[in-house]
């Protein structure tokens, strides 16, 4: 089973204070770019892996999805999602993404935001997702960018008077233990090439891949984001299940 850090009371409390926890999708700087990768949702059966508070689930239903299922390992997250969701067309399920199984060809779109870098066996998950999707259906997800997850000490450093991102161990894939909101948070580092290969091996065609960084307008409104132009924090991916 994956680490369930989000049910740690201290971690959950810290997470609840993040801007994206308070403001939802509109407070997530990468959301406009991720949204652009999505197909029209009218009439689709949508599955959100690592749904958290259910922000995307509610947006998907409002955007025309016929039914939406949100899956998360955290009971605290799901309790918050249910409290915020009155719509009966949205179902929340507590499950480990490494063992969850909704049934063959039962979904028209699988979406995941910043969850798959917690999954150790993402190869197996991609293969199972391909089985859940109808032929030609889509998978859209974001993860922490491999340049962000690779270093043993993921932080900025001053070199020759300039702030730079320290990058090492990029090709050494596997678990990374970091102190983010709490000590001992375990994430999985993979290269961009590995994500591409695993998707293709699972029966997907890659449609788009984007190392997200803020645009000039976003930086104008949020000057602190300027440093994100020097190091991509998120990797956004869209793929289609082969027929």
What annotation goes with each model-predicted range?
Residues 198-243:
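C-terminal lobe and adjacent flexible extensions of AdoMet/dcAdoMet transferase-like proteins
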Residues 143, 147-149, 180-193:
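Acceptor-substrate binding/catalytic loop of class I
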Residues 102-109:
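A short acidic, Gly/Pro-enriched loop at the edge of an enzyme's catalytic core
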Residues 123-138:
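A short glycine-rich, Lys/Arg-flanked "PGG" loop and its adjoining helix->strand segment in the class I
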Residues 1-41, 55, 59, 80, 139-174:
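Conserved class I S-adenosyl-L-methionine
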Residues 47-49, 53-100:
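Class I SAM-dependent methyltransferase SAM/SAH-binding core
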Residues 175, 186-209:
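Short alpha-helix
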């Amino acid at each position: 089973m994956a680490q369930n850090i989000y049910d740690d009371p201290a971690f959950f409390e810290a997470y609840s204070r993040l801007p994206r926890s308070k403001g939802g999708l509109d407070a997530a700087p990468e959301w406009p770019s991720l949204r652009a990768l999505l197909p029209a949702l009218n009439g689709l059966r949508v599955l959100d892996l690592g749904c958290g508070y259910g922000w995307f689930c509610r947006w998907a239903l409002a955007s025309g999805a016929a039914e939406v299922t949100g899956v998360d390992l955290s009971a605290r997250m799901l309790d918050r999602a249910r409290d915020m969701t009155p719509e009966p067309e949205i179902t929340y399920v507590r499950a480990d993404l490494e063992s969850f199984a909704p049934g063959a060809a039962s979904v028209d779109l699988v979406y995941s935001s910043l969850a798959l870098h917690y999954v150790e066996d993402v190869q197996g998950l991609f293969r199972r997702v391909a089985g859940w999707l109808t032929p030609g259906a889509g998978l859209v997800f974001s993860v922490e960018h491999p340049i962000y997850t690779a270093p043993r000490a993921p932080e900025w450093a001053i070199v020759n008077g300039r702030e730079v991102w320290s990058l090492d161990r990029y090709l050494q894939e596997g678990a990374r233990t970091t102190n983010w909101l709490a000590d001992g948070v375990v994430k999985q580092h993979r290269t961009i090439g590995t994500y591409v290969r695993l998707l293709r091996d699972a029966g997907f065609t890659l449609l788009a891949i984007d190392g997200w960084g803020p645009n000039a307008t976003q930086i104008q409104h949020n000057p602190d984001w300027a440093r994100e132009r020097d190091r991509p924090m998120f990797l956004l991916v869209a793929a289609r299940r082969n027929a």
